[in-house]
Structure formats: C-alpha cells, structure tokens
C-alpha cells in the first residue's frame, strides 16, 4: 500500500493544461468542474492539482491552469469558493507573484483575484481575497482596477464565445460535406465512371501508417501500424482525411509516410523507441514513494546554499523535485517526533519508578530488624546445670507410721531427683547466695501431737531432719528467709507428712554482713 494516495484530479488537470495544447479543451474543463461536486474532498484536491500546474516553468501551462481555475470558481459553487478564500491558497498566490513568474501569468492571476474580490465582496466568508489584495498593494504590488478588469473580461468572454460558435459552425459544415460526398460517390460511380477514375487519379493518394492511432472523436479514423490508408484530402498540414477498411475520417499526418517501400522493421524500431520514451516519461511523471530520507534533505540544503540569490536564472528541476519531496516528508517527520517524545516520556516515568524503588530498598535496609525486639520479650529456656558447680544431695529416709497424724495414711516415698541451680536467679532482687533457696518451696517443720514429739524429738523441724540425714554437711537457712519460712508452719501442720526429696543446695559462703533485700513478685 503506498504511503500517499494519488490525487484523482491530477491526470485530468495535466491533460487539460498540456503544453502541446493549441486551444482550451472546454469539454474536459467542464467535466472537471462537474467532478468537483461529486467527489469527496474534490474541491481541495482539484485546487491542489491546479496550483501545481500554475507553478509550472512553462508559461503556456500556467496560463491554461489559470483558465481552468477561473472556470472552477465560476461553476463549482461555494465549496470551491471556500478553498480559494483559504489561507493556504493566499500563501501560494503570494509565492507565485513574489517569485517573479512570467509577467503574463502574474497579470492573469492578479486579474482573477480582482474579479473574485468584486464577486465576493457581499459575503463576509470570502473577505480573505480582498484582504490579500490590500496587503499586497501595501507591499508595492500593483493590481488592475476593477472597471478595466470587467470590460476586458466581458470583451474576452464575448470573443471566446464568438470563436467557439465559429468553430462549431465549421465543424458542422465539414461533417455535412463529408456526408454529401459519401452519398454522391455511388451515383458518380454508376453514372459516370470515367469522371470517378479521373477524380481518384487526381485526389486519392496512398500512405503507410507508421504508428497505431486510436480515434477519440467520431470524425477520426482508426488504423494500425503498417496499414495502407487512402488520402482523400491533404489541404491541412497537420490533419489529413483518408479512408481504409474501417471507414473514413481524419488522422494526423505525422503518423503516416508517403514512402510505401519503407520496411516494416524500421517502423517497428521507431515505434519501440517511441514506446520506450513514453515509458520513461511515465516513470518520471509517476511520484516516487516518499519516506524520511536525510540524504535528500542534506542535498537540497546544499543546493540551496550554493545558489546565488541574485542570479536571475530559474531554479533547476532537480531542486524543485527535492523541495517537493522534502515538503512531503513534513508530516512523516512530525509523526516521528511525536513518537520519540512519547517514548521519552515513558522512559522518564520508568526512571522515576526505579528511583522510588531504590529509595524504598535503601530505607528498609537501614532500618533495625523487628525480630531483635521480639527476642527480648521471650527469655531463653532453662539450661542444664552448669559444669563445675558442685551439687549436694541430701537423702531423706522414710519413717514408720509413728510420725503420721491421726487418720492420715502413709504416702509412698517418691524417687530421689536432683535440681540444678536456678537460671532465673539473676533476674530477681534477692542476693546471689539466696537464689537456690528461694527457688524451691521449703518443707515446713513437721508438727505432731505431743505423743509423737515425745517419742521422736528429732523430727520437730525439717532442719533437724536434714542435719541428721546430711551428717557433716548441715544446712543452715539464711537470715533473710527465716521470717518467710515460719509463715508456712501453721498451714503445713494439717497436711500429711510426706517423704522428703533430696534437694540440691549450694555450699553457703562464709558469714558476711548482708544488706537487707526485699523480694519482689515474679513476673
């Protein structure tokens, strides 16, 4: 799919403004005017194609394009008037007049603008034509007056109408004469054969066709290369009248030769050369696909910098083509710049997000970990007895039922076990030498009836029992615990006497004066 769609009016406009045209083809011009209203965006495309021909370097082509422009303004209605009164058209008109085009082209364009300003002066939508004329007059450009323009336009229109009428009359007369000749030939042949032979010897002439010719009008003759044509009238230097097996009609004299001995091969070679030339011209006229080419832009800038502004010579065709291509690159360059800007914005947003993520990462790395606070709330579990700490075991002997109170059954002796030092002693407020004692419940002294006390005086207190069982290593309670231990005697007297368990008690240090400590409740 091409990047740019072809202008639907370009081919017809080029045909109507061909530099080889001798007169204006009004049938084609009116056909173009009719297509403007029926084609989508027709007014803009048609005006663009016309202005392209107005800027042609051949003045004859530019004058024909201005004639076509005037016909479109007069016949296409308001849609074409709005395009003529647009800013783009005003800019192109300024460029044509200020670039010092051919004087006849400039004068005709100025005359058309004055005529349009007079025609559109009552409609405020078309005031740009008058404003453009006024601005250019202030810049020193001269325009013809409205009165002289009206008179010259009327005279020109009248002359053109008369000329068209004369051409139509001549064409009708030629057609009638041809019909009369066709009707008279059979009668002449039947009535007077000698006169016919004399006429044929005098008028008829045979020629050979060099190229193919396809009839466009009804009164033209179609023939192929190499065919023999009988010439009936050669009074006109350009168009002859002749006949062949297809009929009779007019044909161009340059397409035939009077030399019947010309080899067909030579004509074929000439025809192939002509076809090659036509193909090359078509290829040149076909627009190349436009894309962003930095080389062409640099080349155009280099040519522009090398040109002398004071040089009166017109610009080369190569420069004009490069300028046209560079102008067509404009929208594509704008789209490319928009895409680059959009990608730059996306990358900028991504960069901001990456920086925010890095900042958050650094913040989290520099913060203190939460698990250190959590570990302080949960102390370590009890450890085994530290190595090197002596542990003494006090055996407890079970005694008979003489030491039981009334109604209390004997409890079997439990298995002996050892308790290590209390690991939580360091977190309390008691002195270090009292940790192991306060960590365990002290067995209250056994109080029995008087009979038991008499029979067994050695078991009055738990301390006396422990001293008798331990032998030399007697246990002496600390001073700060005596008051606490005595508070349990009243409650323990009603309980049955249980078998004692060996308790690990550290060796008490030498007696030292100690400060008073107060026990705090455990957490």
Swiss-Prot record:
Gene Ontology biological-process annotations: protein transport; signal transduction
Assigned GO CC terms: early endosome membrane; endocytic vesicle
Domain ITAM: 360-377
Topology of this chain in the membrane: Peripheral membrane protein
Post-translational modification: Phosphorylated.
Family matches, as SUPFAM superfamilies: ENTH/VHS domain (SSF48464), SH3-domain (SSF50044)
Ranges for region Interaction with USP8: 219-220
Domain SH3 as annotated: residue spans: 202-261
Domain VHS: 16-144
Stretches the record annotates as Interaction with HGS: 334-368
Location relative to the cell: Cytoplasm; Early endosome membrane
Predominant cellular place of this UniProt entry's protein: cytoplasm
Entry-linked InterPro entries: ENTH_VHS, SH3-like_dom_sf, SH3_domain, STAM, STAM2_SH3, UIM_dom, VHS_dom, VHS_STAM2
One Gene Ontology term of the molecular function aspect: ubiquitin binding
Alphabetical UniProt keywords: Cytoplasm, Endosome, Membrane, Phosphoprotein, Protein transport, SH3 domain, Transport
Residue stretches making up the UIM domain: 165-184
Gene3D superfamilies given in the database record: 1.20.5.1940, 1.25.40.90, SH3 Domains
Span(s) of short sequence motif PxVxL motif: 54-67
Comment text on domains: Contains one Pro-Xaa-Val-Xaa-Leu (PxVxL) motif, which is required for interaction with chromoshadow domains. This motif requires additional residues -7, -6, +4 and +5 of the central Val which contact the chromoshadow domain.
Subunit structure: Component of the ESCRT-0 complex composed of STAM or STAM2 and HGS. Part of a complex at least composed of HSG, STAM2 and EPS15. Interacts with JAK2 and JAK3. Interacts with ubiquitinated proteins and the deubiquitinating enzyme USP8/UBPY. Interacts (via the via the PxVxL motif) with CBX5; the interaction is direct. Interacts with VPS37C. Interacts with ubiquitin; the interaction is direct. Interacts (via UIM domain) with UBQLN1 (via ubiquitin-like domain).
Family: Belongs to the STAM family.
Primary role: Involved in intracellular signal transduction mediated by cytokines and growth factors. Upon IL-2 and GM-CSL stimulation, it plays a role in signaling leading to DNA synthesis and MYC induction. May also play a role in T-cell development. Involved in down-regulation of receptor tyrosine kinase via multivesicular body (MVBs) when complexed with HGS (ESCRT-0 complex). The ESCRT-0 complex binds ubiquitin and acts as a sorting machinery that recognizes ubiquitinated receptors and transfers them to further sequential lysosomal sorting/trafficking processes.
Name of the protein in its database record: Signal transducing adapter molecule 2
Source organism: Rattus norvegicus (Rat)
Gene that encodes it: Stam2
